Regions:
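Phosphodiester-processing cores and adjacent nucleic acid-binding clamps
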Residues: 1-205
């Protein structure tokens, strides 16, 4: 039986815009090894700054833990267009190789170059058209997943369920259409490198 590989993890580098996480990269990696994981991906919130520290520690532990793998990723904010008052959906990207990491850097640079302030916070989204354009040159080198409850798939599915519970079939259909459009976009953009994130939870939603 294959051991678990954690594909969605945050470190203190996710605090670049707001307080989000207290994990130091070294501590997170050590804990993953202690738990018997086969590896983890570092996916901070629109931040690649921790990757150098992660790589340095990966080299340090390579001899003692040769089978433990560390992947480098980014949790981006994916939107249809940049405008105030929108939902900034979370989306996970993980580099499969050095070429994929170059794609992550290009996407992150695009997001930060076009940053703006909305509701008192600096926002750093990337649009779907920008993501699709960049990935047209890097397909096969980046893994994508739907992320957490902050992702578009989870949000739309949750809202569809709420609409169905009150028999609001019009809204439910709209959320269903949103899910279909989102899934088609992801499959077209990432092909077989697109995955749906599943997370255990005791929360009712």
């Amino acid at each position: 039986m294959e051991r678990y590989f954690g594909l969605h993890n945050h470190t203190m580098y996710s605090n670049i815009r707001l307080l989000d996480c207290i994990n130091r990269p070294k501590d997170l990696i050590d804990k993953a090894i202690e738990l018997g994981l086969s590896g983890i991906a570092i996916t901070d919130h629109e931040c690649l700054s921790g990757h150098m520290e992660v790589n340095q520690y990966a080299q340090k532990i390579k001899e003692k833990h040769p089978d433990f793998k560390i992947a480098l990723g980014n949790e981006i904010y994916l939107v249809d267009e940049r405008t105030n008052g929108i939902k900034y959906y979370h989306f996970i990207l993980i580099a499969k190789d050095a070429i994929g990491h170059k794609a992550l850097r290009e996407m992150s640079s695009t997001a930060w170059y076009n940053s703006y302030v909305d509701r008192g916070m600096e926002r750093v989204p990337i649009t779907k058209s920008e993501l699709s354009n960049i990935m047209s040159r890097y397909q096969g080198h980046v893994i994508a997943s739907t992320a957490c409850m902050g992702g578009e798939l989870s949000t739309a599915a949750y809202n569809m369920t709420l609409a169905e519970e009150v028999n609001d079939l019009v809204s439910a259909q709209q959320f269903y259409n949103q899910i279909c459009d989102f899934m088609n976009f992801c499959i077209t953009t990432f092909g077989e490198d697109f995955y749906i994130e599943c997370a255990p939870s005791t929360a009712e939603d």
